[in-house]
């Protein structure tokens, strides 16, 4: 990499911090230049504060609304007829399908045959009106173990090396010319069948590349001789591995330069892949799947190579239905991963990672997928992607054809209708200071917003509920987890009083106020003039939510009635009771872990 390229990349290396230890996940990398560390949210210079209202983001209509991701086996001759039949049988479920190149490094001859199989499957999808796309599921590699379980006969390039000199067996050095040439050729092969989009997966990241990042090491980046030599040229100083590692650990400025250099190397790799796709299929859009911090150089390389705004799919965790609250928590986290990048000319539509692991019936249900999709749309995502099928297990295709896909097909119109009703709107609620808001706060009827929002200000101190434990005095509200503890044991009276406190803090403009305590996620969406467009509700409990009265603000003056929409039920018309600026609505009974939304007409 030239000194000039390094300097350019240095301006692209900003990233969103990972969750804190309290919120779960890997601690944030330091030196997040250009960020407002008080809240772990990035704020661009010259931009409005994240607590201020900003321009309305339109729904991106040209993007297929719901994509299905699946493993490479489903496009092979013995599996594709079954999957094609399942998709035909449940045509409304999906608008796009992402094929896969697999998770190892087979020969280019294998990829050539696989591209031919994908081309045939793509023709079948187009006849159904489904957009065919593909993800390059492995470039650097997820882990040595995952890569090594497959065919690695095509790997003839160097591997990553840790800061203490430990070489990986399969994890790839991102600057190796042979690696770049291999994936440029793979990209060209698949671009020949004109995919709607080509995605690079979250293995192409700057963290969690085991065993390079091992306990006691934890320095990201490749410390092979070639990468150290490239950094030395950029620095104008010769570095040895041990001295460089020590300098990175002890010098924050050095750490920043190393981060920027390493991310820039990956950006050059993505630029080469995107340019290869663009040469063969100029209309194909590039996408980037990632978990944790977003290093701008990587998707920026996709933009520079293709000329198209890059679609983003942040992700990370909650792959089971064992704790639906965590899926809501994840939805907030994903929004925060996008904060600071929305509105950039090189960023296009964004979707959430909705994923099951290992894609069988014991992990996720159709209802769980629908709820997670609904929550992410409520918080501001543009479209949906679901990794919901895999042929690596012994799961038979009839499970998808007869169980999972039919429910998703039924819910598609509900989800798309909700998305359309939110065109030109933003979520509206309170801002919080921690990156992942306590899930029980959002699930007690208090609207909390993530990145793309209209803020009512800071969330009032939950300790004001004043909870006491029977026989043990007051709750320790100074604990790092006090929000969860207090909200978990709050009485109905204490919670109802907290609603009133929140409304006072918002100057009496809180768009949705429950008249009595609920266990529910509520997310109002408002237009530029603060009029109310929709109110999303999820019953966040294992029991039904009995009918409850909701006080609304900002209901359009011309609205005569409200309509209650649910995924698998008829719409219900509800009377509006106007009392000055307030409008009262009586919500019907909501089933356990069920969702719906109000619109107005």
Task: Give residue ranges: language-model regions.
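Active-site-adjacent "subsite" loops/lids of carbohydrate-active enzymes
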Residues: 134-193, 206, 236-259, 263
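Catalytic domains of carbohydrate-active enzymes, especially glycoside hydrolases
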Residues: 75-105, 192-197, 372-383, 446
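The substrate-binding groove and active-site-proximal loops of carbohydrate-active enzymes
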Residues: 66-77, 100-114, 165-182, 250-268, ...
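Active-site neighborhood of glycoside hydrolase catalytic domains
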Residues: 182, 192-197, 201, 206-207, ...
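Aromatic-lined substrate-binding rim segments of carbohydrate-active enzymes
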Residues: 84-87, 101-153
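Substrate-binding cleft/loops of secretory-pathway carbohydrate-active enzymes
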Residues: 208, 257, 261-333, 360-377
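Carbohydrate-binding surfaces of carbohydrate-active enzymes
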Residues: 279, 283, 292, 324-601
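Aromatic-lined carbohydrate-recognition surfaces of secreted/lumenal glycan-active proteins
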Residues: 63-75, 133-139, 199-203, 256-299, ...
